[in-house]
Amino acid sequence: MAAPPAKGNTEQSEEGDLPQLPVSPKPDDEQSRSQSPTQLQDSPEAGGEQEEEQAFLVSLYKFMKERHTPIERVPHLGFKQINLWKIYKAVEKLGAYELVTGRRLWKNVYDELGGSPGSTSAATCTRRHYERLVLPYVRHLKGEDDKPLPPTKPRKQYKMAKELRGDDGTTEKLKKAKDSEERRVEQTTPGKTKSDATGQTQLPCQGSSRDSTEQLGPVSGPSPPLTGASSCPEAYKRLLSSFYCKGAHGIMSPLAKKKLLAQVSKAEALQCQEEGCRHGARSPNKDIQDSPQNLRGPAENSEHQLTPREGLQAPGGSTRMEAQVGPCPTAPMFSGCFHAYPTEVLKPVSQHPRDFFSGLKDRVLLGPPGKEEGPTTKESHLVWGGDANHPSAFHKGSTRKRSFYPKPKACWVSPMAKVPTERPGAPSPHPSSPGLGSKRGLEEEGFAHGGKKLRAVSPFLKEVDSKETGGKPAAPGLAVSCLLGPTPGPTPPEAYRGTMLRCPLNFTGSADPLKGQASLPFSPLVIPAFPAHLLATTGSSPMAASLMHFPPTPYDAVLRNRLGPASSAWHMPPVTTYAAPHFFHLNTKL
């Protein structure tokens, strides 16, 4: 290795036979003092001390080299290079290393070396240099084992040792605490989502709502027909679970709840469009029992399940209609999602207001006859959001067979309360007859821009005259749905032929915005109608007896009672025969 940087001076003449040994360098003033005449007079004592110092340094360098920790350079302390012989003698004079360390005498050692008195770290630096350069050799001389160097500060020694002893235990405790916390969060989150989704299987929480809606498609695609009804609740549940997994821990403010419901409604509608087309192409031609489940959000308290069995067309050409209607719930919530099946039956995914009228049957929405060819061959675009390029969820099925009732026109109920209304001057995307089309435009314009306080118009079933339908014969088997709420666009006039259920189409046209769009957070109500041949043939049957005349009710009362039982808003007098009252126009004052 490298030689010692500083060589000792040559011994005096009387010790000339000793070899030249490396000694710790001395400053010039010390060397001049050592060479002073007074020290030259005491040359025998000075020579013996220098000889001892030189022997010590030779053996020290040799030992440190054999120990593989050679002393390549001697550090400076207090603006002076350390004299290893002096520091060794000072520590031995004060009682060896252990006693100096125990009594905190390293500052005295520093003073013996003649360092600058203003140094703040003098004691610590002196001790470290001694431990690194001299202490191993001193222990070797005393026959002690070469122990590892003790910690720097003895008072903090106890705390550090205590922390080191408990290090493994504390880390294990921290890991166990983290694991238990993660398990507890994982247990609470599935419980929350299960209570929201009413017993459905828990799906993994996704990072964003877009990923969850994209991954839902291939999962629920090849499922049995029941997944067609549960795909929208699963989309709602996955979005809700992803919201809770982002750190909300089950606590939602009202504003966050409204935002979440809006996001869920958008994603739900898009998902239902994809799933409706997918299930519409794969459903078998047999009775399909649908179990729509009422979506219960964080703020809902009641849960009611409805199991409508919608019969398909019998061989004789008649339609079998059966429904099992449960008791009227107190606070229903609506999702407004539908699926289209190849048998032209419109399946509701969740509970709708038509289920709360015990006399009304859960029915199909049928369209005009003989419109499969000609200018209406193209699909009537049920636009939601104003984008007509996206495929609708209500494409016709793959079956082309002719049935007693022709191809129906699906009725889309928007899950959003705020739907952009079309301009009154915009051309209608649906083919319309001249007479009825102009009347429909005037009616919608009057309701949308009238600015008057609207009153609920009593819905009645009435045959449309052939004059209003453009001189064409009315088909007896057609019925339409009445939308109590904002409509995405003008309804095709062909859907109003035959038996009709007349209801105001724009309840949100009120001048008071708080009573209009803001007060309808969920889907507008849907009141189904019936084919005319059933009304004509059932005379005093229970369904005919259950037809009700709804008295004119203020719009405020309708809003107050829209979440309550139907009997509180409209009374149902027993009717034995069907009376055809006069025709009401939408812009007629009551």
Swiss-Prot record:
Post-translational modifications reported in the UniProt record: Phosphorylated by MAPK14 on serine residues involving a TLR4 signaling pathway upon lipopolysaccharide (LPS) stimulation leading to its ubiquitination and proteasomal degradation.
Subcellular location: Nucleus
Region: Disordered, residue numbers: 1-52, 141-229, 275-323, 367-402, 419-443
Cross-link Glycyl lysine isopeptide (Lys-Gly) (interchain with G-Cter in ubiquitin) mapped to chain: K80, K89
Role this protein plays: DNA-binding protein that may regulate transcription and act as a repressor by binding to AT-rich stretches in the promoter region of target genes. May positively regulate chondrocyte-specific transcription such as of COL2A1 in collaboration with SOX9 and positively regulate histone H3 acetylation at chondrocyte-specific genes. May stimulate early-stage chondrocyte differentiation and inhibit later stage differention. Can repress ESR1-mediated transcriptional activation; proposed to act as corepressor for selective nuclear hormone receptors.
GO MF, one annotated term: nuclear estrogen receptor binding
Protein name: AT-rich interactive domain-containing protein 5A
Native species: Mus musculus
